[in-house]
Amino acid sequence: MAMYSRIIGTGSYLPEKILTNLELESMVDTSDEWIQARTGIKQRHIAAPGQMASDLALEASRNAIEAAGIQASDIDLVIVATTTPDMIFPSTACILQNKLGISGSPAFDVQAVCSGFIYALATADMFVSSGKSRNALIVGSEVYSRIMDWNDRSTCVLFGDGAGAVVLTRDQKPGILSSHLHADGSYSQVLSAPASIHSGKIQGTPFITMEGSTVFKFAVKVLEEAVLEALHANDLQSSDIDWLIPHQANIRIITSTAKKLGIPEEKVVVTVTQHGNTSAASVPLALDQAVRDGRVQSGQHVVLEGVGGGFTWGSVLVRW
């Protein structure tokens, strides 16, 4: 008998501190009007000093586990998608596993930048649907404020901190229908934080650098392709999509992708206005919001998609 993986709980967490566009006006040469016109972003959340990716992940995980109606001890796989880990090693997943009071089962990080949650969810699906895992915890958690050059108005206005999580369980009823992952390392310099450590010293800039126009054109192209790939694999049409939950990078990327796919705006979940770009956390944050406010309902087709530095990109098609 074929087995599938199904999302049975979602959770999220946003740091208390909110940084508005008006506050950014006093920090860097920008304006609320300029930011909103180009990105759609009104505000973003910023982690407190000493608040790490694992701390945000812990709160989101607790909410997802509670929503799933299980105990932390039932989790037998932890995957954390992050570009801003607590430390070089051990993995943030191992740190999170310990904070949850569990041990013994696999725990590891996935680093695919803003596609990280898509990569992590696809990986967990393979574990769960094959019987290698019963209940998987998948988390996207980021503290991008730590790698931000707050003097660079082209990047510092874009990003925020946060975490989102889901619990995936094995089921006879289809949940995740298919996943589709891609990468092209020839674009590795287009969007990066190119620092490295040699002999205890940081070489290169630890801050985000980005060629915005290249990112925009590439993102719209491959996000459309990733959704079409998922639809074709399941003999579905764009009209069959109940909800598109994209990576929340920029409102123009989101609306341009939806328009190319012929998906009306009212079927697109948008949180970038309030959260900014939270990288690997953006998709699970948006998913949790749409689940908790009742938009996502049983039996609906939900497409999750993301694109990030590398470039990496992908999609996951879910029957809720």
From Swiss-Prot:
Does Transferase count among this protein's keywords?
yes
Location (main, coarse): cytoplasm
Its EC top class is transferase
Entry annotated with the keyword Transferase: yes
**Active site (catalytic residues):** C114, H247, N277
| Keyword list, A-Z | Acyltransferase, Cytoplasm, Fatty acid biosynthesis, Fatty acid metabolism, Lipid biosynthesis, Lipid metabolism, Multifunctional enzyme, Transferase
Q: Which InterPro entries match?
A: ACP_syn_III_C, ACP_syn_III_N, FabH, Thiolase-like
**Where, subcellularly, is it found?**
Cytoplasm
Its GO biological process terms?
fatty acid biosynthetic process; secondary metabolite biosynthetic process
Question: ACP-binding: where is this region?
Answer: 248-252
- A Pfam family annotated for this UniProt entry: ACP_syn_III
Which reaction is recorded as catalysed by this protein? malonyl-[ACP] + acetyl-CoA + H(+) = 3-oxobutanoyl-[ACP] + CO2 + CoA
User: According to the lineage, what is the superkingdom?
Assistant: Bacteria
Under SUPFAM superfamilies, the record lists: Thiolase-like
Cellular compartments per GO CC:
cytoplasm
Q: What is its EC number?
A: 2.3.1.180
Q: Which GO terms describe its molecular function?
A: 3-oxoacyl-[acyl-carrier-protein] synthase activity; beta-ketoacyl-acyl-carrier-protein synthase III activity
To which pathway does this protein belong? Lipid metabolism; fatty acid biosynthesis
Domain note: The last Arg residue of the ACP-binding site is essential for the weak association between ACP/AcpP and FabH.
Write down the NCBIfam families for this protein, in alphabetical order: fabH, PRK09352.1
Q: How does it assemble?
A: Homodimer.
PANTHER family, sorted: 3-OXOACYL-[ACYL-CARRIER-PROTEIN] SYNTHASE 3, BETA-KETOACYL-[ACYL-CARRIER-PROTEIN] SYNTHASE III
Concerning its family, UniProt says: Belongs to the thiolase-like superfamily. FabH family.
Function per UniProt: Catalyzes the condensation reaction of fatty acid synthesis by the addition to an acyl acceptor of two carbons from malonyl-ACP. Catalyzes the first condensation reaction which initiates fatty acid synthesis and may therefore play a role in governing the total rate of fatty acid production. Possesses both acetoacetyl-ACP synthase and acetyl transacylase activities. Its substrate specificity determines the biosynthesis of branched-chain and/or straight-chain of fatty acids.
Please report the name of this protein according to its UniProt entry: Beta-ketoacyl-[acyl-carrier-protein] synthase III
Q: Which gene is transcribed and translated to give this protein?
A: fabH
